[in-house]
From Swiss-Prot:
It is an enzyme of class 6 (ligase). The keyword Lyase does not apply. PROSITE patterns: AA_TRNA_LIGASE_I. This is Leucine--tRNA ligase. HAMAP family: Leu_tRNA_synth_B. The lineage of its organism: Bacteria, Bacillati, Cyanobacteriota, Cyanophyceae, Synechococcales. A motif ('HIGH' region) lies at residues 56-66. The gene is leuS. It comes from the Bacteria. Belongs to the class-I aminoacyl-tRNA synthetase family. Its EC number is 6.1.1.4. It holds the Pfam family Anticodon_1. Its main location: cytoplasm.
């Protein structure tokens, strides 16, 4: 039964001065009273649809990127409801993390209180947008009733052998004596707080074995046909599956010492002129000669202060030193020097590479810098020359200077040399991955505690499930100094071992916030479950997510971790599917008008630019560059959503941000275009106000979601044209909102329909006009939900517009009785005539020759030729 809505006596609001704030506030209260946005219990055979935006970090202030993300998802959710689906459209908060901890330190406040305050502020801002979110399912990752289950899932992964602890490199601040996140290290490698030069240290860290799923993560990308190709490519490159060979180089003078390298180019083995170890490689200490000890130690100390990014940057010089050892090239017995270098990383492959400078650009640069031999072993195809002396040849070719393997193609050489090496025991085929296991340890306070206890007797002991959650202590010292804040809380750290009862201590690391965001989409399906993180049957009914919307910046980490979690939980029989998101839409950035001084790189506030036609720096007078860049405070180009809503209303903000650009493209903010959308909505108000029910029908009149039932034979030409425009709009907008979603062109079609109705409603029968307006209002409802609700009420619609069905095309309305035919004479267009849509060529020729156009331009001549393009034109050639 449809619940009653406000009476039509309130309809005067739309015909009076448009006051979006009053109108939108009124309808938002009504929707809340009615509970329209709650997720329904799906009826038998009713299709479920899960629409989800990537949930935000609660900074406390909404920005235009948020608005675009959530409005896109809201339109999709509203359309699916009107199509008859049971829709789940939730929202939550990615609430743990470094920003809240830093804010708490700076302001001397509790990060939990700070975060809850921000959540309340942002929810109020989101509510103003008219989003149809089921807030009953709201989750915050920092709340105990959520992170209890993050810990539960960690223990599941631990039980499955997917969580483990090992030593890893971290950023260490030697002054504050604490671990820093990468974001806390500036471009010069210094701590953001103390200014100290950051060191690289080895600490025990927790990892998840995401590499166990490397093949599944890359192979299953082919099944994600609803994902952008760009995202799938980015993930494949990040996983970085490489097929090659593992080669063993024996250390000269030592019987049992072997350096193992992985290479994707075993065909170039004869061209190896040195072997390079990572400075952290365990063999460096053992193989370094006494003569090189000082140089090697100094180099290792230098490298320990550099980040991985600095060590591997393409524009950085490739530094290294020899360690005084030699290895034997197994394919030809040559002795090769062993070096350590900054560009080789210990945790990639075996931490050792063979240097083939003629056929690897990085090796080429290193060899040139250190005067190492460069031997060509691959000749360029179809060329007598091997390659340009100024660079490495990394492409395919024919093997030369390779002994028995000369003349083979590179692909043949890879197989032949690997096979030969395998028969001799020094080579084997190998698949290598760029992907590393996921380091989840953070030496921070504001994160999910890792539910592990360390016991001297029992080792690593999981916290019993009945003792979850392991909660964060409150009123803790957050000075940002002295290592992990949790490690300072002895009352919290010291516990008894659950197994032996002896003294033990808690794990003081907290989890990476990506742990919390890797499963939140599952909790939304069963948010109040107090026994488990979610019920398998319920989750399997709603998931995978039908439509996921978020920024391209999450293409790798968040989306990859969520896919890993889903696969791991599937293998633990906790869920029945292997991929979390069926369809992914990555919306573009919102960019603002930006003024930049190209001489010094500074950004200038638009408020300081006096002449927009000739913008100049107010201090130097330098001419300013005008461009659009991602909105940010530092560029003075941000637009506050609250200001836009206060002035124009949420419907205008929604319409602009949906209309300005296709959803996946960057959007350039333009105040004039915002004003244009506001004027369009005002035109719609005037259009609706121009429709008046006849006096005889007024008391019982009610607009319907049903199509017109009058026979087309009984319709006037005006009525036929109005119905055709109406149903063409249904066809076009339905297409725009299906598959490859194009919200901007859908709004264009809305504009076309409204223009076609303008000034014509009083020229057709009430039933025809009412059908057209019913369609118009229903088509606009997902985009401008407040005004659509107001219009529906004014037109005496029953219930809420958002409870109505999506318009259905009447194919008969699209059938053309007549068409416009172009008449050409001597190939030039001379005019058009109306002809029956089903006229054949003979009839078209006859109608064309009898037309006034032909009489005028042929001047009594008979055409020598008549060229007919059915449905398009007739060309008369005298």
């Amino acid at each position: 039964m449809t619940e009653s809505f406000p009476s039509t006596s309130a309809s005067s609001h739309s015909s009076a001065r448009y006051d979006p704030i009053e109108l939108e506030t009124r309808w938002q209260k009504e929707w809340l009273r009615q509970g329209l946005d709650r997720t329904p219990v799906a009826e038998t055979n009713q299709k479920r649809f899960y629409a989800l935006s990537m949930f935000p970090y609660p900074s406390g202030k909404l920005h235009m990127g948020h608005v675009r993300n959530y409005v896109i998802t809201d339109v999709i959710a509203r359309v699916q409801r009107m199509r008859g689906d049971a829709v789940l459209h939730p929202m939550g908060w990615d609430a743990f993390g470094l920003p809240a901890e830093n804010a708490a330190i700076a302001r001397n406040v509790d990060p939990g209180d700070w975060t809850d305050q921000n959540i309340a502020q942002m929810r109020a801002q989101l509510d103003r947008l008219g989003l149809s979110i089921d807030w009953d399912r709201q989750q915050a990752t920092c709340h105990q009733d959520y992170y209890r289950w993050t810990q539960w899932l960690f223990l599941e992964l631990f039980a499955g052998g997917l969580a483990y602890q090992k030593e890893a490199t971290v950023n260490w601040d030697p002054i504050d004596k604490t671990v820093l996140a990468n974001e806390q290290v500036d471009g010069e490698g210094r701590s953001w707080r103390s200014g100290a030069l950051v060191e690289q240290r080895q600490l025990k860290q927790w990892f998840l074995r995401i590499t166990d799923y490397a093949d599944a993560l890359i192979d299953d990308l082919d099944e994600l046909t609803g994902w952008p190709e760009r995202v799938r490519t980015m993930q494949a490159n990040w996983i970085g599956r490489s097929h090659g060979a593992e080669i063993k180089f024996r250390v000269a003078g030592q019987t049992n010492s072997i350096i193992t390298v992985f290479t994707t180019r075993p065909d170039t083995l004869h061209g190896a002129s040195y072997v390079v170890l990572a400075p952290e490689h365990p063999l460096v200490e053992a193989l370094t000669s006494p003569q090189q000890r000082i140089a090697v130690t100094a180099f290792c100390d230098l490298i320990s202060q550099l980040s991985v990014k600095d060590r591997t940057a393409e524009d950085q010089p490739k530094r290294g030193v020899p360690i005084g050892a030699q290895v034997i090239n197994p394919v030809n017995g040559e002795s090769l020097p062993v070096w350590i270098a900054d560009y080789v990383l210990a945790d990639y492959g075996s931490g050792a590479v063979m240097g083939v400078p003629a056929h690897d650009e990085r090796d080429f640069i290193f060899a040139r810098s250190h005067e190492l031999p460069i031997r060509i072993v691959v000749q360029m195809p179809d060329s007598d020359e091997h390659h340009n002396d100024g660079q490495a040849w990394t492409g395919a070719g024919v093997l030369v200077n390779s002994g028995a393997f000369d003349g083979l193609s590179t692909e043949e050489g890879k197989v032949a040399i690997t096979t030969h090496g395998a028969s001799k025991g020094w080579a084997q085929s190998k698949v290598q991955y760029r992907l590393r296991d996921w380091l989840i340890s953070r030496q921070r306070y504001w994160g999910c505690p890792i539910p592990i206890i360390h016991c001297a007797s029992c080792g690593i002991v999981p916290v019993p499930q009945e003792d979850l959650p392991v909660t964060l202590p409150r009123d803790i010292d957050l000075s940002g100094k002295g290592g992990s804040p949790l490690a300072q809380e002895q009352d919290w750290v010291e516990v008894k071992c659950p197994i032996c009862g002896e003294k033990a201590h808690r794990e003081t690391d907290t989890m990476d916030t990506f742990m919390c965001s890797s499963w939140y989409y599952l909790r939304f399906a069963d948010p109040l479950n107090s026994q488990r993180p979610f019920d398998k049957d319920i989750v399997d009914e709603w998931l995978p997510v039908d439509q996921y919307v978020g920024g391209i910046e999450h293409a790798i980490l968040h989306l990859l971790y969520a896919r890993f979690f889903t696969k791991a939980l599937h293998d633990r029989n906790l869920i029945g599917f292997k991929e979390p998101f069926n369809t992914l839409l990555t919306q573009g950035m919102v960019q603002g008008l930006t003024y930049r001084n190209t001489k010094n790189g500074s950004y200038i506030s638009p408020e300081l630019v006096s002449d927009e036609g000739d913008p100049r720096d107010p201090e130097s007078g330098d001419k300013l560059e005008i461009l659009f860049e991602k909105m940010s405070k530092s560029k003075y180009n941000g637009v506050d959503p609250a200001v836009v809503i206060d002035r124009y209303g949420a419907d205008t903000a929604r319409m602009f941000i949906l209309f300005k650009a296709p959803p996946e493209k960057d959007l350039e903010w333009d105040d004039a275009d915002v004003e244009g959308q506001f004027r369009f909505l005002q035109r719609l108000i005037r259009l609706i106000d121009s429709f008046v029910w006849p006096k005889t029908d007024e008391d019982n009149a009610s607009i319907s979601s049903a199509n017109l039932t009058i026979s087309s034979a009984d319709l006037s030409e005006e009525e036929i044209n109005m119905r055709r425009a109406t149903h063409m709009a249904i066809e076009a907008i339905t297409e725009d909102l299906s598959g490859d979603i194009q919200l901007n062109t859908a709004i264009s079609e809305l504009m076309k329909l409204s223009n076609s109705l303008g000034g014509k409603l009083d020229k057709v029968r009430t039933e025809v006009a009412a059908e057209a307006l019913s369609v118009l209002v229903r088509l606009m409802a997902p985009f401008a939900p407040h005004l659509a609700e107001e219009f529906w009420m004014k037109l005496h619609g029953q219930g809420s517009i958002h409870q109505q069905s999506w318009p259905i095309i009447d194919p008969s309305a699209l059938v053309l009785e007549t068409i416009e035919l172009v008449i050409q004479v001597k190939g030039k267009v001379r005019g058009t005539i109306q002809v029956p849509a089903n006229a054949d060529k003979t009839a078209l020729e006859e109608l064309a020759l009898k037309s006034d156009i032909a009489v005028k331009w042929l001047e009594g001549q008979s055409p020598r030729r008549v060229i007919i393009v059915p449905g398009k034109l007739v060309n008369l050639v005298p």
